[in-house]
UniProtKB/Swiss-Prot annotation:
UniProt-listed CDD domains: WD40
Gene Ontology biological-process annotations: mRNA processing; RNA splicing
Protein's name in the database: U5 small nuclear ribonucleoprotein 40 kDa protein
Keyword Nucleus part of the UniProt annotation: yes
CC terms in the record's Gene Ontology section: catalytic step 2 spliceosome; nucleus
Keywords: mRNA processing, mRNA splicing, Nucleus, Repeat, Spliceosome, WD repeat
Main location: nucleus
Organism of derivation: Dictyostelium discoideum
Nucleus among keywords: yes
SUPFAM superfamilies hit by this protein: WD40 repeat-like
Task performed by this protein: Required for pre-mRNA splicing as component of the activated spliceosome. Component of the U5 small nuclear ribonucleoprotein (snRNP) complex and the U4/U6-U5 tri-snRNP complex, building blocks of the spliceosome.
Ranges occupied by WD repeats: 60-99, 103-142, 145-185, 187-226, 230-269, 280-319, 322-355
Subcellular location as annotated: Nucleus
Amino acid sequence: MENKRKQKDEIVLVNGSNDTTPNKKQKNELQVVSSGGGREIILGTERTSKLEHPIMQLIGHKGEIYSCKFNSYGTALASGGSDKEIFLWNVYGECINYSVLKGHKGTILELHWSTDSNEIYTACTDKSIGVWDSNKGELIKRIREHSGVVNSCCPARRGPPLVASGSDDRSARIFDTRSKGSTHLFQHKYPVTSVCFSDASDQLITGGIDNVIRVWDIRNQEDPLYTLASHQDTITSTSVSKDGAYLLSNSMDNSCKIWDIRPYAPPNRNIKTFNGAQNNFEKNLIKSSWSIDGRRIGCGSSDRQVYIWDTNTKQLQYCLPGHSGTVNEVTFHPNEPIIASCSSDKTIYLGEIKP
């Protein structure tokens, strides 16, 4: 075929070893990346990050993806879902899928990196919590103390290597990964769908299908310090801001809320509510997250969009299309204006936004 000059808006499709890739990549290219080697390139966007292209689509999972997180350095992304595997991806360059961690026997519902990024923790429907060596790609420990699906897990930011978990068995537990057995047990009347630690790691925050968020002093496993009861449906995620002052929650009532969890805060701790993101009949545990500076929050949605709000003005800054299935998690890069989103459509997007 006679070569023709490529137009600015042309899409170049390259599969495998096909040699039609342009020799010089433009600064403003967008790229779709597959772990199988194929990619598409679209031209025409102003750059704000060190991503190789403004939008990168990561393909390789064989099932729905329910969780994705950047490591603390922002150089790697971990993802997990219904194919029972954890994929590790390079964030920069060609976004290569450099490792696949296998060992779970059920769907991975949530994952987190340790603070030093040397370990990954996973919550799974096989009733276990996995502790993985992210460098060797090996399973270090499988914790089996729950009698039901483990919906959520979260490592402590400070102190000993503690990991919290929440389960359909109506309990939340805390484990020290250096020892056997749980160190703390928090009984609930209903399944626990989300857990997270306070910034100081001296409190555990739990949410469940009774629509209530409970804040526990980990030294007192009998009764919570206080409860946060403003959501009208199941709590699907909880996360604490970087400064430890605020809690972000997401719910099946189609709202995200910010709570003041500082000591001596007024009784009505719900200070802001963000509407727009949806949760439909699938009833997925859709997750929300903070940007590292706390100026933005992001949330997945069953309407296949990525939602990002300004936390000061409550203004919706972005409603981003692209996925063809429910967006189950949105997470922010620790150093750059980059977001990652994972979906039931088996794909992940990395995209840069304005600083």
